[in-house]
């Protein structure tokens, strides 16, 4: 049996990599946060906004101990042939090859980043491959995931512009990179 699970979270090297190694307003260690022991309530302000998890590590250029999407395998996979298509939506077509000696399952992930923004997971696939087998994969970004909210118009709008595209087995592993635009 070949392992194929992937981490749904990122693990830091140390607490110093976290957005908030110590909670503001907490005068004591975290284990004393039991309200029955008289710990007064306090507010926590989440200044990182939506930049949490793998996005926090990218924004701060920190390398986690184990990134979102990390997994183990007894075989190896190689990626190639990236073709990115833009227009009214965004998609990436590429190949994944089992270059090892055992059958295995790979989970390629598609990340995109608009200009001045951090990467965001917009698609993934789970692919079972025998040794030497190659498969062509196409992942499409849901346009709703790339939309931005126009507060003045009170509606979502397509996020036009240029996008950097990354494909790989985990958030911290870019096997392929490209770019395209949404108009």
Located regions from the model:
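Intrinsically disordered, low-complexity Pro/Gly/Ser/Thr-rich segments with frequent PxxP/GP/PP motifs
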Residues: 117-151
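Secreted, periplasmic, or luminal enzymes acting at the cell surface/secretory milieu
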Residues: 1-91, 96-105, 111, 160, ...
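Terminal connector regions
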Residues: 142-183
